[in-house]
Regions:
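Conserved catalytic motifs of ABC-family nucleotide-binding domains
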Residues: 735-812
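Active-site-adjacent bridging/hinge elements
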Residues: 35, 103-107, 264-268, 287-291, ...
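Anion-coordinating catalytic cores for phosphoryl-, nucleotidyl-, and glycosidic chemistry
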Residues: 512-513, 523, 528, 778, ...
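Core structural elements
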Residues: 93-104, 152-180, 288-291, 316, ...
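Conserved ATP-dependent motor core of P-loop NTPases, especially the RecA-like helicase ATPase domain
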Residues: 16-20, 56-66, 71, 75-237, ...
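Conserved ATP-driven helicase/translocase motor core recognized via long
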Residues: 26, 56, 158-307, 401-403, ...
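Conserved motor-region signature of P-loop NTPase helicases/translocases
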Residues: 1-76, 127, 131, 138, ...
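Conserved helicase/translocase P-loop NTPase motor core
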Residues: 95-102, 129, 222-225, 286-335, ...
Length: 921
């Protein structure tokens, strides 16, 4: 087997088969090709052969598509190397996702494990989880009065907005997901409780006595309230009365601000802990009912003979742990175990894989890139990758043959200037400013790559900042600016089909698409969980509900006739809804379903072409319901309406919409295949399908001429000549009422703050409204000006403080989310081959009645990115980036209002309404 074309690092990976191998593979470094060659080498005579056949190779990757790609590459390479016999065994090889591997093991041992061997895999457990919540609440909800005093049942916000929409149903769903993913299920969950201790708060108020008259008055009132609470019954109502009576004094010359802030932090810690302690019955009830939901969910799965992905991992782990014979069998079966996308695994998956890798894990090869770990929301733990790397590096440093680390840093995808752009942000600048990522794996450009930049006179590295205005105005300005840049590239000869906009989220995808179309550029939304929002998905939904129940016109016939499939307007609907009384001759109203099935229209509303066409298509279709497959009927209606023909004539956008129609029809066919001839059940199943996070339909647009819009996650593994990146820079702070933290032992600690508050009476009998209590409590934790922050937590919080734990969990969540955002930006930028545009924005807030640019480094990357890419000390309107070849226009400031940043003042220069810079034509 010829290895001469491989780089030295690739050759090391391919030929190192006798020890644990850790591969850190940068973006665009050809890792899939290298893994394929490694399998071939292990099968080749030159290696021994190291393996007797593909059945001794286990290759795990993150997605089904990636597994299919590796299988096809292995098959083609085997054929090319003359190993046709081995190529025939590819379909039976252990090349799959980890869930696919688990499913295969469980089916093979189903009877001895007490599992139905015909089990189905529940890809989206959301519906069944919701059903479990609904059943338990309807059956047992009345027994949990304390809980419903803390949280609304569903879909409500607490007074004052403190609940943030938190509800019993949403919390139960969160706890169910956490328990399902835990190694030991619900027993791994532990709710932290507070304690009632106001001694520290009393001491803090005593420290204010005698300083000023105001401070003394505030301290006396607070101490009296605390004394009354300590002497009385410890109830939530009495605690609220005490809490509302404690008003910290204002700082002054004699009462330093630092002392007041410490008092506020002490008060926040004391009252939050006391409230959690006195309300502990509510949080215990939350765990109790969540446990009941967990049991109900498991019973529902058992009744339906389904397992979710967490079950697959947990049951396989338990089977190998508890069955020595199985563990011995699988532990010696594979001579090669390779895990691709290792950065997207979690500890449970690693523990499971360790059963399969032989003594000391010698068979294991892990491949990944910590800088591309962007699936934390699915449970990925990037620290698992880092710990594994550190362990193998330590073994290698000791001269041991127990492990080896290899880095793939040659990037075959991107131009050197793009890689320099990435490095400037994440590794640091030539001027010595440190980058966003510690331990950054820098990539080297491949000298032999073909340059795909067609446009001339355009720098490959560009950025823009939209400042001020509302969130919507900034988004519109951003979209207009990106579209204008793409238009300029197209005018300079750059193919539009190679341009893509990568977004951190898709809520505004249509707004960006409209901006591209306004510039005369075709545009398709090709990736992201937006399928349910498309007109095509809604149109097919209306069709299937019409076929299921013609009389249900609200969700069926009315939207069907109004959509692009039939395009009826007001006159046509009036014709369907108007009849003539045969006896009196007077006109009267009729239901539109009756109008559809009747030919008797009133004078002046007869012979309307759109009505005639709708009747000609839908009447025969309705007559077929119950005789023919519903999916076939729906497909015929779509075709006979002429909709697909019309879409085909609308260019790339029309083809993309047609792909959505076909995806919807396929979903109906799949539902019908599972449910049989049951139109209403098929319609309900399609509704559930829409509730899932579905990407738009896809047609083969190779060589097309449209800008594509997709999420960064959808772009993973892809590459494009021209990339713009937007909505990838900021996060929301982690202020959810329920916070959690997973320990090293797998246990999950929880702290739940209340979502709503009762009214109470003060010591003098005055009525205290619940929303006033909520506003007071909101001051303590979670807000931008909260009284208890990490700055004071060490001074006021005891080691067992639930308030301190919630704060630490919240700040940890925010920090981890921002780190994930850094990695998301890295993935987005490394999709670019020739050109990369970063589109950022920042709000303007009032500081001392002056508008100031608001760059918050704790929740937004924008300020740090600007610091990396702008020349040191440069103004925001300087127009240049920090690179030597930069020229004016590479950076653009779109100021939607006047503002200040540092010592510089900036004047509004852009109008969103006009879509251009002020003064431009």
């Amino acid at each position: 087997m010829d290895l001469s074309t491989l780089m030295p690092q690739q050759r090391d990976i391919v030929t190192t088969l006798d020890r644990k191998l850790f591969v850190s593979a940068g973006a665009g470094s050809g890792k899939t090709f290298t893994l394929t060659r490694r399998i071939l080498w292990a099968l080749s005579p030159e290696s021994g052969p190291f393996v007797d056949g593909l059945d001794q190779v286990l290759a795990i990757t993150f997605t089904k598509d990636a597994a299919a790609e590796i299988r096809e590459r292995v098959r083609a390479a085997l054929v090319a190397e003359g190993m046709e016999r081995a190529a025939l065994s590819v379909d039976d090889a252990w090349i799959s996702t980890i869930h696919g591997m688990c499913s295969r093991i469980l089916r093979a041992h189903a009877l001895e494990l007490g599992i139905d061997p015909e089990f189905s895999v529940l890809e989206d457990p959301g519906d069944l989880m919701d059903l479990a919540v609904e059943r338990v609440l309807s059956r047992e909800g009345s027994a949990y009065g304390d809980l419903f005093g803390w949280y609304p049942l569903a879909g409500e916000s607490a007074p004052g907005g403190f609940g943030g929409g938190t509800s019993v149903t949403s919390l139960l769903r969160v706890l169910l997901e956490k328990a399902s993913a835990a190694r030991n299920g619900f027993s791994d969950l532990r709710m932290l409780q507070g304690s009632v201790n106001l001694d520290g708060l009393a001491d803090a108020y005593r420290g204010c006595m005698g300083i000023t008259a105001g401070a003394t008055k505030a301290a006396e009132a607070a101490l009296a309230a605390i004394e009354a609470f300590e002497a009385g019954e410890k109830t939530v109502g009495n605690l609220i009365a005490c809490m509302m009576a404690c008003k910290p004094p204002r700082s002054s010359k004699n009462l330093p601000k630092e002392q007041v802030n410490l008092l506020k932090a002490e008060q926040a810690d004391a009252f939050v802990n006391a409230y959690l302690a006195l309300g502990s019955r509510a949080t215990q009830q939350l765990l109790e009912i969540a446990h009941a939901v967990f049991d109900e969910y498991n019973q529902l799965k058992f009744d339906r003979s389904v397992l979710d992905n967490n079950d697959l991992l947990r049951l396989t782990y338990q089977a190998l742990r508890d069955n020595p014979a199985m563990r011995e069998d699988y532990g010696s079966r594979f001579k090669m175990v390779m895990i691709d996308e290792f950065q997207d695994t979690d500890q449970q998956q690693v523990d499971l894989i360790n059963f399969l890798t032989g003594e000391g894990g010698r068979a294991l090869c892990t491949v990944g890139d910590a800088q591309q770990s962007i699936y934390r929301f699915r449970g990925a733990e990037v620290d698992v990758f880092r710990r594994a790397q550190a362990q193998v590096e330590a073994a290698a440093a000791c001269g041991s043959d127990a492990g080896r680390v290899v880095q793939l840093v040659k990037n075959f995808r991107s131009h050197a200037e793009i890689l320099d752009y990435v490095a400037a942000i994440f590794d640091g600048t030539p001027q010595g400013r440190g980058g966003l990522m510690q331990g950054f794996l820098n990539l080297q450009a491949h000298d032999g790559r073909k340059d795909g930049m067609v446009a001339t006179g355009v720098n490959r590295r560009q950025a823009l900042l939209v400042a001020g205005g509302s969130t919507q105005e900034r988004a519109q300005a951003r979209a207009q600016a990106i579209a204008r840049r793409f238009r300029e590239l197209a005018d300079a000869g750059q193919p539009v089909g190679g341009m893509v906009l990568l977004l951190g989220g898709m809520p505004r995808a249509n707004m960006y698409a409209d901006a591209f179309r306004a510039q005369g550029l075709d545009c398709v939304i090709s990736g992201g969980s937006v399928f349910a929002q498309t007109q095509e998905a809604a149109a097919v939904r209306a069709l299937v509900w019409t076929l299921a129940n013609l009389a249900d016109t609200a969700q069926g016939l009315a939207p069907l006739l109004a959509c692009d499939m039939f395009s009826l307007g007001a006159q046509e609907f009036l014709a369907l809804a108007t009849a003539k009384d045969e006896q009196t001759g007077e006109t009267r109203r009729r239901n539109i379903d009756a109008g559809l099935m009747s030919d008797k229209d009133v004078d002046g509303l007869r012979d309307l072409p759109l009505v005639d066409r709708a009747r000609a298509v839908l009447r025969p279709a309705l007559s077929r319901v119950g005789r023919d497959p519903l999916a076939a009927i729906a497909r015929d209606v779509v075709n006979q309406s002429g909709w697909m023909v019309r879409l085909a004539g609308q260019g790339a956008e029309g083809r993309a919409r047609a792909a959505n129609v076909l995806k919807a029809l396929d979903a109906i066919a799949e539902a019908e295949a599972q449910l049989g001839a049951a139109p209403r059940q098929v319609a309900l199943a399609y509704d559930r399908f829409l509730e899932g996070k579905q990407a738009p339909g896809a047609l083969n647009e190779e060589g097309g001429n449209a800008v594509r819009i997709m999420t960064v996650h959808a772009s993973k593994g892809l590459e494009f000549p021209v990339v713009a990146v937007a909505e990838c820079f900021s996060i929301k702070s982690g202020n959810a009422k329920l916070q959690s933290l997973r320990g090293d032992d797998g246990s999950i600690s929880l702290v739940a703050l209340p979502g709503q508050f009762p009214s109470a009476r003060s010591a003098d009998g005055a009525y205290i409204k619940g929303d006033d209590v909520a506003k007071e409590f909101k001051k303590y934790l979670g807000g931008s000006s909260a009284w208890l922050t990490s700055e004071y937590a060490d001074d006021v919080c005891a080691s067992d403080s639930a308030a301190g734990a919630w704060l630490a969990m919240s700040e940890c969540e925010t920090r981890l989310e921002l780190q994930e955002r850094e990695r998301l930006l890295y993935v987005a930028m490394t999709r670019a081959r020739e050109y990369c545009l970063l589109a950022m924005d920042a709000p303007v807030r009032s500081v001392n009645k002056q508008p100031v640019l608001d760059l918050r480094d704790d929740t937004d990357l924008t300020g740090r990115v600007l610091e990396q890419i702008l020349p040191a000390g440069a103004a925001l309107n300087g127009g240049m980036l920090c690179f030597e070849d930069s020229r004016r226009g590479d950076f653009e400031l779109l100021a939607l209002q006047d503002f200040a940043c540092g010592d510089a003042a900036y004047t509004q220069n852009y109008s969103v309404e006009d879509g251009c810079f002020i003064g431009e034509d």
